[in-house]
């Protein structure tokens, strides 16, 4: 749980009226590590229950003694649920949030944004024409996909979640990575993101081809091609781009460098405000083409970011979100929900059975 003082500071950071170059008011549980050339931008299968009659009996007795509404088996000292419920996933959420709070040793003080990026990149490979890719499979565990340039640096996020997977072997990597993204968004004071489990893990044969994720060095034609392939429209593209309020780029991953906003641990509409209200110029350096703010030269925008104010249709939504954080949150939540569920063969009739997890700030 975050301390009361940190929660107050973070809430104040979001609620206060900011000048364009005000320093971040909060560092809390949120995080600042989105990197890799993206636009927003080796593990085993889950353990299975033992077939031992003795293990089954011991597990059943233990569950009965605990008053549990499900049975489990003992597998290497870890409980494997057969019918996990909302409360079980809330427990996993809470443990992810605790790890975010207890591990401030990553980029800018938290792993939050890199967890969002992991969930995003696991989902953003979807192709509606072939029905391949998406968050179902967690195929980034394997070298073909994990080694794609757009996924550089995401091993840190996958490794961060490994202790959670070991503690709760009943959750698939696919569901865990998305739950990690949901948790990170909410713990960084973003909107509530509805969640439903049901993803399964696949082997390396299901890895998607390289090139399905956005290239931040490109402009609106490329951006539309990538997102239209997944089934998004212009409004949803701009809403999803708002995730660039979080984290930063790294020269050793994407080649780009710097954060998009001054408060990269709190999700707000500042990204859109800065795009519209600040003057941007090409950065003078030996790296790939990117922009810096003319005043402080401490913020950056990528070519794919700039198309949100260069393209007439994109700019319309950029203005709307800059003017209305509540509207941004509403549309961002809906677009992220759609992204995280692309290509997942959920059981029929579960569309209205999504869960909302309680953040640690409540």
Curated annotation (Swiss-Prot):
Active site: 121, 260
Keyword Transport: no
Gene Ontology CC terms, in alphabetical order: mitochondrial intermembrane space; mitochondrial matrix
Residues the entry annotates as binding heme b: 244
Location, primary (coarse class): mitochondrion
Compartments (UniProt record): Mitochondrion matrix; Mitochondrion intermembrane space
Domain of life: Eukaryota
Cofactor remark: Binds 1 heme b (iron(II)-protoporphyrin IX) group per subunit.
Alphabetical keyword list: Heme, Iron, Metal-binding, Mitochondrion, Oxidoreductase, Peroxidase, Transit peptide
Names of required cofactors: heme b
Site (Transition state stabilizer): 117
Single GO MF descriptor: metal ion binding
E.C. designation(s): 1.11.1.5
Feature: transit peptide: 1-40
GO terms for biological process, alphabetical: cellular response to oxidative stress; hydrogen peroxide catabolic process; response to reactive oxygen species
Entry's family note: Belongs to the peroxidase family. Cytochrome c peroxidase subfamily.
Oligomer status and interactors: Forms a one-to-one complex with cytochrome c.
Reported function: Destroys radicals which are normally produced within the cells and which are toxic to biological systems.
Designated name of the protein: Cytochrome c peroxidase, mitochondrial
């Amino acid at each position: 749980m975050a301390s009361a003082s940190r929660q107050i500071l973070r809430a104040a950071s979001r609620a206060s009226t900011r000048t364009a170059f005000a320093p971040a008011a909060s560092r809390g549980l949120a995080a600042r590590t989105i990197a890799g050339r993206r636009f927003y931008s080796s593990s085993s299968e889950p353990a299975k229950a033992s077939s031992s009659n003795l293990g089954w009996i011991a597990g059943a007795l233990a569950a009965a003694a605990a008053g549990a509404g499900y049975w489990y088996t003992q597998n290497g000292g870890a409980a494997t649920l057969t019918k996990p419920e909302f409360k079980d996933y809330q427990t996993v959420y809470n443990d992810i949030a605790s790890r975010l709070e207890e591990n401030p040793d990553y980029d800018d003080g938290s792993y939050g944004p890199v967890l969002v990026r992991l969930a995003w990149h696991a989902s953003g490979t979807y192709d509606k024409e072939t029905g391949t890719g998406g968050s179902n499979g967690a195929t980034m565990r394997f070298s073909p996909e994990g080694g794609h340039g757009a996924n550089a640096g995401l091993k840190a996020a996958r490794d961060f979640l490994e202790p959670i997977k070991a503690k709760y072997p009943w959750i698939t990597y696919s569901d865990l990575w998305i739950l990690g993204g949901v948790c990170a968004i909410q713990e960084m004071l973003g909107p509530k993101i509805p969640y439903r489990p049901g993803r399964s893990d696949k082997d390396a044969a299901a890895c998607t081809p390289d090139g399905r994720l956005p290239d931040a060095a490109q402009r609106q034609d490329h951006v539309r091609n990538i997102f239209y392939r997944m089934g998004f429209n212009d409004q949803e593209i701009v809403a999803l781009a708002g995730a660039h309020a979080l984290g930063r780029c790294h020269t050793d991953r994407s080649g780009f460098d710097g954060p998009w906003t001054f408060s990269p641990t709190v999700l707000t509409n500042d990204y859109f405000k800065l795009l519209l209200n600040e003057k941007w110029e090409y950065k003078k350096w030996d790296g790939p083409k990117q922009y810096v703010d003319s005043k402080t030269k401490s913020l950056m925008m990528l070519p794919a970011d700039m198309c949100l104010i260069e393209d007439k249709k994109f700019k319309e939504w950029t203005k709307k979100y800059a003017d209305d954080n509540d509207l941004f949150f509403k549309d961002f939540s809906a677009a992220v929900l759609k992204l995280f569920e692309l290509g997942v063969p959920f059981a029929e009739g579960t569309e209205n059975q999504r869960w909302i997890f309680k953040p640690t700030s409540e």
